């Protein structure tokens, strides 16, 4: 069950994030550790869960709506519906599973296919505390993330290593993207206004010349 009841809201201070990755990489453990500050080791396979938490980002309070997605292929349709509505994405693999790392590319492709523009994405490697079972090096993860312009961290849901940092960073990226959009839209409106005034002045000048002739 979800940790918080979800209420649909158009509040500008509400932000939708999506946690994606193969089954068994610890998406739910990561999310619950962030939401409730405790580690869940045994958990039923997730279908779709939505969690909520208030966070202070750049001196402003935001309500984070965090979708913990299913890893199963048969639930792609549900996942696709939610991807379209999310602002930022956390892609998760396990350092103990080479196959989960290889699957990150497919999740990236899915986001690019469903989103019409570039969105903030951070890639994280969970279970960094299980170094003896490691199949993916830190350098491999960092190189892959750099190739696709993503931030990268290794985390441990069990020991809450870098968990808060991950969610704070993706939320900050989303806030910056919102601000950039506002600035761009304002610049476009200003340019359109200047262009309109210039055309009006040009037309007035033209009419004045015509009257003189």
From Swiss-Prot:
PROSITE patterns: RAS. Its EC number is 3.6.5.2. A motif (Effector region) lies at residues 43-51. GTP binds at residues 21-28, 68-72, 126-129. It is a lipid-anchor. GO terms for cellular component: plasma membrane. Coiled coil: none annotated. It catalyses: GTP + H2O = GDP + phosphate + H(+). Residues 211-213 form a propeptide. Keywords: Cell membrane, GTP-binding, Hydrolase, Lipoprotein, Membrane, Methylation, Nucleotide-binding, Prenylation. Transmembrane segments: none annotated. The keyword Cytoplasm does not apply. It comes from the Eukaryota. The modification Cysteine methyl ester is found at residue 210. It is an enzyme of class 3 (hydrolase). GO terms for molecular function: G protein activity; GDP binding; GTP binding; GTPase activity. It is found in: Cell membrane. A lipid is attached at residue 210 (S-geranylgeranyl cysteine). GO terms for biological process: signal transduction. InterPro entries: P-loop_NTPase, Small_GTP-bd, Small_GTPase, Small_GTPase_Ras-type. Belongs to the small GTPase superfamily. Ras family. Ras proteins bind GDP/GTP and possess intrinsic GTPase activity. This is Ras-like protein rasU. It comes from Dictyostelium discoideum (Social amoeba). The gene is rasU.
């Amino acid at each position: 069950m979800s940790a918080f009841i979800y209420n649909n809201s158009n509040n500008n201070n509400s932000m939708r994030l999506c946690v994606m990755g193969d089954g068994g990489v610890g998406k739910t453990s990561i999310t619950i550790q962030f939401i409730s500050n405790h580690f869940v080791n045994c958990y039923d396979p997730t279908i779709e869960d939505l969690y909520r938490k208030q966070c202070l980002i750049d001196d402003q309070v935001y309500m984070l709506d965090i979708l913990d997605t299913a890893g199963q292929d048969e639930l792609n349709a549900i996942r696709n519906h939610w991807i379209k509505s999310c602002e930022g994405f956390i892609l998760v693999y396990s350092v103990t599973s080479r196959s989960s790392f290889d699957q990150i590319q497919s999740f990236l492709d899915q986001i690019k296919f469903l989103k019409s523009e570039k969105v903030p994405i951070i890639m994280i490697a969970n279970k960094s505390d299980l170094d003896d079972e490691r199949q993916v090096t830190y350098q491999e993860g960092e190189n892959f993330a750099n190739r696709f312009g993503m931030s990268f961290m290794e985390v441990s849901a069990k020991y809450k290593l870098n968990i808060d940092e991950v969610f704070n960073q993706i939320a900050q990226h989303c806030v910056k993207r919102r601000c950039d959009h506002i600035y761009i839209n304002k610049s476009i409106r200003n340019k359109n206004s200047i262009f309109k005034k210039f055309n009006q002045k040009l037309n007035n000048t033209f009419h004045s010349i015509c009257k003189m002739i």
